[in-house]
Amino acid sequence: MEFFNTRFWLLASGTLFTVFPTIAALSGSTVADAPAYWASFGSLSDREAAMAAVVELAWGFHILALGLVVLGIGLLATDPLRARLGVIAMVGFAVSQILSAGTAAQFGYGGADAMGAFAIVVIGVPLLTLVTCAVRWNSRTVVKS
């Protein structure tokens, strides 16, 4: 397997985007941790904590939906279409997350604490996927007989 394999990296990113929000939502950690992200307001009322949980769940389900799209691209498309759709999906994902976090920060959103080594995976896999898809933008499908 070559390093710049669009199918592999799209499946890796799609799995990352699908599995982790699902685990966080099902385990209850999304709801339990949500008020801490708005710590700049001090202690939240029950209603405010519920609203914070809804924001976190919606954000997580948005990531999950993008993960399913990325998995679909990885499984159903062939190069160069897969590479081109992969670039669009990865750029779209990055822009949506930057806009979401940036907009929420204007309203006092503090975000998650430092994630340590896990942050390398969360940032590295999509970044490698973007680079791989960009490198393979004009690739040709090789038919072996």
Residue ranges with predicted function:
Residues 1-23, 138-139:
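Cytosolic juxtamembrane helix and N-cap/initiation of the first transmembrane helix
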Residues 125-144:
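Membrane-water interface at the C-terminal end of transmembrane alpha helices
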Residues 55-63, 116-125:
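Alpha-helical transmembrane segments of polytopic membrane proteins
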Residues 17, 61-71, 125:
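Core segments of transmembrane alpha-helices
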Residues 15-60:
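Hydrophobic transmembrane helix segments
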Residues 68-91:
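Juxtamembrane helix-break-helix junctions at the cytosolic face
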Residues 86-104, 122-128:
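Hydrophobic alpha-helical membrane segments
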Residues 99-119, 136:
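Membrane-helix boundary connector in multi-pass membrane proteins
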